[in-house]
Structure formats: C-alpha cells, structure tokens
From Swiss-Prot:
Pfam families, per database record: LCM
Catalytic class of the enzyme: transferase
Family of this protein: Belongs to the UPF0677 family.
Name of this chain's protein: Putative S-adenosyl-L-methionine-dependent methyltransferase MMAR_0358
Function (record text): Exhibits S-adenosyl-L-methionine-dependent methyltransferase activity.
Gene3D superfamilies named in the record: Vaccinia Virus protein VP39
Biological-process GO terms, alphabetical: methylation
Keywords: Methyltransferase, S-adenosyl-L-methionine, Transferase
InterPro entries for this protein: Ppm1/Ppm2/Tcmp, SAM-dependent_MTases_sf, SAM_mthyl_Trfase_ML2640-like
EC numbers, comma separated: 2.1.1.-
Length: 311
C-alpha cells in the first residue's frame, strides 16, 4: 500500500512488518553455525502467534521458484540474512566503541524490534532511549517481559512518530542535551520523505553536545541509484504479476513503503557540512572484512554505513 504523510502502523502492518523481517534475519543468523551476531531475543520477538501472518508473508517474499525468470532481482533470503548480520555487527561495534569512549546516553531512532538495550554489555549509568510508534514499542516490551527479559541499560521508551516533534518527546523522557550522545538511524531513511530526513539530521545536530556520535545506514540517493531503483521497481512489478498468477502471496514488499521523492540528503555530506567529522564504509567491503562474501555488487551490499563525530 502506498505511503501517506500521516500513515501509522503496528508491528504486524506496513513499516512495522519490516522490523519483523529484520528480526527474522537476526534470529536465523543467531541459529547459524558461525554467527556474526548473537541476538537471543530475536526469535522470541518474532515467534508470537500474532505475527504468524507476517512470517508467512516474509517467507513468500524471500522464496525463489523455478519460474522466477529474473534471478538477479529475486530476493535471496541468505543474502538478506548475511547483509543484516553485517549491518547489525557494524552498529553493535559502533555502540561498543562509543561507550568505551565514555558516552552514556544512547538514542535508537525507529527502534522497531531492536534488542540492543537487552543484549549489549552496557556500562553502568548508560541510558538507552528507543523512539518508535507506541504500538511497536508496546509489543516489544510486553513480549520480552513475558520471556523474563530485562534490559541491561536503563531503557526509556519514547513513543512518537519521527515525522512529528520527537525531540521534545525525547527531552520529556529525560534526555539531556548537555551530555554526549550516540545516535543510530539504522534501516530508517527510505521510510522518511526527504523533508523529514533533513529535519531528522537537523534535530540530531541541534540536540548533540560536543563529543556526540551518529551512525546512519545510507541508501543510494544519487541519480544513477534512483534510475536503477526505478528499473528494479518495473522488473519487480512484472515478477509480482507472474507470482500472483501462480497464487503466491505478494502482500509483503518493503520497497512499496519507501519514499522516493527528490532532495534526499546524503548523511555523510550533510554532517560534514555541519562541522562533524565523518567516515563511510560500503557494506560490501565490511562483509568481506568480516569473512562474509558479498553476494553481489547490487542489492543491499551497495549501501553505506556512515558514522560521524561532533568535535
């Protein structure tokens, strides 16, 4: 279903369902023989009865059949699992480095089913703020509580839409602008229109003390990437029609939920222009460094992981 400026969701619908897909990949990676990451909370979060339909929809999206005549475009579940494992490992390391440098205030934007507050070894005095829609945060809190899980850090939920005045909601939850902060925007940018992306970066900058850090998953925004995305959308439309004719479930497709409006900022350029020291790592290179073969130079492995520090 196309996005609208004021749409909303719970964990089983729209953008919320993409968090389930990501957690399914983390659960699969954790259960593998040589996992890059260990997320013992992913499987409990995605195995509830209320998510049965979403699990089936994601499985159908990941499925490959002999009739799929565009194998370069067909979603490969192992490719996605590998990519999301590499991504999770990178941003886990980012937080570990941040707290080692003395940062004790953490903000996870669009937290979804992120379990880092529960599974990372946070030093005493660390506070983790999770921002997402109320129904998404409620689902995670109640599900983990039923499994007896308790956060390692002080966890504060901030139930607010990132398209609204989330900085005020964050401050109301106890966030202190005078303290250095480690921010994370993982898997977020495509789900925000360009204006909201600019506003997000502006708010991060305005609420960051000296010594703060930010990490952002960067999706292609240049003209070549935009044209490639349009071509992929056309190819997927043809493939979707064939799958529908075979009776396959095509109701889940994260790309349907992305905004593709003009003017989306490059986070590395944006933060550099605002005085931050930036670095950027291509996901494919990071995968190779970790011993995971990037399946292709297409798809998610062309994404970049951007980090920046405020002097």
């Amino acid at each position: 279903m196309p996005r609208t400026a004021d749409d909303s969701w719970d964990i089983a619908t729209s953008v919320g369902a993409t968090a389930v897909m990501v957690a399914l990949a983390r659960a699969a990676e954790t259960a593998s023989e040589t996992p890059l990451i260990r997320d013992q909370f992913a499987e409990p979060l995605v195995s509830t009865p209320e998510l049965a339909a979403v699990r089936e929809q994601v499985a159908a999206w990941w499925a490959q059949t002999d009739d799929d005549d565009d194998p370069d475009f067909t979603v490969d579940s192992q490719q996605m699992t590998d990519y999301l494992a590499v991504r999770t490992h990178f941003f886990d390391s980012y937080f570990i480095d941040a707290v080692a440098a003395g940062i004790r205030q953490v903000v996870i934007l669009a937290a979804g089913l992120d379990s880092r507050a529960y599974r990372l070894d946070w030093p005493g005095g660390t506070t983790v703020y999770e921002i997402d829609l109320p129904k998404v945060l409620d689902y995670k809190e109640h599900t983990l509580a039923r499994h007896g899980a308790a956060p390692v850090a002080a966890l504060r939920a901030v139930p607010v839409d990132l398209r609204h005045d989330w900085p005020q909601a964050l401050r109301d939850a106890g966030f202190q602008t005078s303290l250095p902060t480690a921010w994370l925007a993982e898997g977020l940018l495509p789900f925000l229109p360009a204006a909201a992306q600019h506003a997000l970066f502006t708010a991060i900058d305005a609420n960051s003390a000296t010594g703060s850090r930010v990490a952002v998953e960067m999706f292609g925004v240049d003209e070549d990437a935009r044209r490639a995305a349009e071509e992929r959308a056309q190819r997927w439309a043809r493939q979707r029609a064939k799958r529908q004719a075979r009776g396959q479930d095509t109701s889940f497709d994260p790309f349907d939920l992305w905004f593709d409006d003009e003017g989306q900022p490059d986070p590395a350029d944006w933060f550099a222009a605002h005085g931050w020291t930036t670095d950027s790592v291509q996901a494919g290179a990071e995968a190779l460094r970790l011993g995971r073969t990037a399946h292709s130079q297409e798809g998610p492995f062309v994404n970049r992981f951007v980090t920046a520090g405020k002097p």
